[in-house]
Amino acid sequence: MVLKVKMGDIGVGKSPESIETLLGSCVAIILYDKGKKIGGLAHVMLPKSRMQKEKNPGKYVDTAIPELITKIVKMGARKDRLTVKLAGGAAMFGNNSNNIDVGKKNIEASKIEIKKIGLRVSSEDLGGDTGRTITLSLKDGSVMVRKGSELKTI
């Protein structure tokens, strides 16, 4: 079964499922426990929550990460065994000085928050100017990244 995660949402599951999302400037924060074959993905849209944190914790980097950890730990994952992968954060609107590079800000915030909770990023596919589709296999924790006709695993 493939669980599709929408913008601002969080999806969790266990082997043999997979989790998929489509990214532009948003970032996918992927956590996986190899021992239990449990993982999840947060499709974050913005770096920081200001108001209404409880309403949609998956929308913001600073609220999505703790929520994702809580959800997968409830399924049986162990925080001390989690691997972290990041994908997305494209500059979808060019590098015009009038535009705020939301993708870059999402990337920076994701790395800061991951470090704050004592985890580190094991692999990533970030930036650029092209959207991507990612699929997390909960069988082995691999993440397939598709950008146009380009396909790679992180």
UniProtKB/Swiss-Prot annotation:
UniProt keyword list: Chemotaxis, Hydrolase
One MF annotation (Gene Ontology) recorded for this entry: protein-glutamine glutaminase activity
Keyword Transcription: no
Chain coiled-coil ranges: none
EC number(s) reported in the record: 3.5.1.44
Cell cycle listed as a keyword: no
Catalytic activity field: L-glutaminyl-[protein] + H2O = L-glutamyl-[protein] + NH4(+)
Gene3D superfamilies, A to Z: 3.30.1330.200
EC class of the enzyme, as a word: hydrolase
Biological process according to GO: chemotaxis
InterPro entries membership: CheD-like_sf (IPR038592), Chemorcpt_Glu_NH3ase_CheD (IPR005659), Cytotoxic_necrot_fac-like_cat (IPR011324)
Family assignment from sequence similarity: Belongs to the CheD family.
Functional summary from the UniProt entry: Probably deamidates glutamine residues to glutamate on methyl-accepting chemotaxis receptors (MCPs), playing an important role in chemotaxis.
Protein name: Probable chemoreceptor glutamine deamidase CheD
Organism from which the protein derives: Methanococcus maripaludis (strain C5 / ATCC BAA-1333)
